Amino acid sequence: KLGKFRDAREELHKKDEPYRRAANSDFIIYLLTLMAVAICIRTFIFEPVQCIGDSMYPTLMNGEGMFTEKLTYAVCEPQHGDIIICRYPYHTEKCVKRVIAVPGDRISISDGAISLNGEKLDESAYWSGYIEDSEMPEVTVPERSLFVVGDNRNHSGDSRHVGFIPYCQVKGKVRAVMTPFSQARWI
């Protein structure tokens, strides 16, 4: 009896072979499509980024995972106060900084404070300290460039040290903190 059962099972498998192959190839196509969509979303729309260091304290803490959106700056320019992910010229690592000045703005640092277009910048929402050892004569931000700083002014390598950030080095706008989940919030 076992031989007849085995023969019947093999016959059934032979009949189902084309259907199983089609189902397997459909599944593989589905997985490849899903992977391509995920790669496109990460490359062109959203990207998770981790905050490394304390340069954005207290707004962002070291180790927090952020949600970065990339489409905004494809249709509009960065604005004062935006928190962005960028690369410094001649550097490969990404960093997170706040936009302080946009093209055409005049910026200077004196007496421990930043002045924008001749007026002391109101930074009370994210900075309440005194900028130590940082005097900078007035400069004008060139076209298609930004002046960025970390919220933790005295512990941040930023435009005061590396110069203006060209638009082409802006990688996205920080929209939210995702991790740790207990600290999740919109920016």
Where on the chain are the PLM-derived regions?
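Protein maturation boundaries and topogenic segments
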Residues: 1-94, 165-187
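Extracellular/periplasmic catalytic domains that process cell-envelope and extracellular macromolecules
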Residues: 59, 107-108, 139-142
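Short beta-strand-centered aromatic/proline hotspots
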Residues: 96-100
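Short strand-turn-strand beta-turns centered on an Asx-Gly dipeptide
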Residues: 110, 116-118
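Acidic loop->beta-strand submotif enriched in PP2C/PPM serine/threonine phosphatases
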Residues: 127-144
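Phosphate/adenylate-binding glycine loop and adjacent helical scaffold
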Residues: 150
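Active-site loop architecture of trypsin-fold serine endopeptidases
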Residues: 154-161
